C-alpha cells in the first residue's frame, strides 16, 4: 500500500512539473560561419539589458557591448568604425530584434515595449526578424561569433528579472 501511495505521489509530481509554463526561447543564429564564439549568458545575472553600444562601419556591424543592470559586458568584435550608444528607459525592454546579414551582421534594429525603434548599420543583405516565442518575455542576453566584425548573432528571451533594484 505504501508503494502505491509513493507511486501516485511521484506521478502527480512529475505531471505538475510537465505542465509548468515555459518562458525562455532562442532566436538565431543569424550571420556567417566565421569568428570566435561569445555569450553574455552570465551577464544576465547582473540585471536586465539597460543600454547597448554598437560599432558600425560602411558595411557591417563591427562590434557590440551590452549593459546588464549597471555592468557592461565585455566588448566583442573589431575596433574600426563609429561607436553608437543607446540607453533604455527604466523598465523598458527589447521585445523584437530584426536586421540583415550576409557573411557578417550588417544591420540590427531593436524594438522596445515602449514603441521605440533603434536601428544600427546598413539596410542590405538577408533579412531576419526575431521575437520571443512566449508572451511577456523580453531580450535577456546576446550570443554569437565575432572577429574583426560581428560574424553572427543569436538572441535569448526570458521574463524580465524581478531582482534588479537599480535598473
Curated annotation (Swiss-Prot):
One of its GO terms (molecular function) is peptidoglycan binding. This is Zymogen granule membrane protein 16. SUPFAM superfamilies: Mannose-binding lectins. Gene3D superfamilies: Jacalin-like lectin domain (2.100.10.30). Residues 1-16 form the signal peptide. Belongs to the jacalin lectin family. It comes from the Eukaryota. It comes from Rattus norvegicus. InterPro entries: Jacalin-like_lectin_dom, Jacalin-like_lectin_dom_sf, PolyBind_ProtTraffic. Expressed in pancreas, colon, duodenum, and much less in stomach. The keyword Transferase does not apply. May play a role in protein trafficking. May act as a linker molecule between the submembranous matrix on the luminal side of zymogen granule membrane (ZGM) and aggregated secretory proteins during granule formation in the TGN. Disulfide bonds: none annotated. CDD domains: Jacalin_ZG16_like (cd09611).
Amino acid at each position: 500500500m505504501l508503494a502505491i501511495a509513493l507511486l501516485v505521489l511521484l506521478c502527480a509530481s512529475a505531471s505538475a512539473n510537465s505542465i509548468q509554463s515555459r518562458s525562455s526561447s532562442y532566436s538565431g543564429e543569424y550571420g556567417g560561419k566565421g569568428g570566435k564564439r561569445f555569450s553574455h549568458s552570465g551577464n544576465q545575472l547582473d540585471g536586465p539589458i539597460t543600454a547597448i553600444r554598437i560599432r558600425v562601419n560602411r558595411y557591417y556591424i563591427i562590434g557590440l557591448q551590452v549593459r546588464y543592470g549597471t555592468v557592461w559586458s565585455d566588448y566583442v568584435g573589431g575596433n574600426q568604425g563609429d561607436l553608437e550608444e543607446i540607453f533604455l528607459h527604466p523598465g523598458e525592454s527589447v521585445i523584437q530584434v530584426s536586421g540583415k546579414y550576409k557573411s557578417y551582421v550588417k544591420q540590427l534594429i531593436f524594438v522596445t515595449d515602449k514603441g521605440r525603434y533603434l536601428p544600427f548599420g546598413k539596410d542590405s543583405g538577408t533579412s531576419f526578424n526575431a521575437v520571443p516565442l512566449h508572451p511577456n518575455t523580453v531580450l535577456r542576453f546576446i550570443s554569437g561569433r565575432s572577429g574583426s566584425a560581428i560574424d553572427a548573432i543569436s538572441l535569448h528571451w526570458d521574463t524580465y528579472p524581478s531582482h534588479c533594484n537599480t535598473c
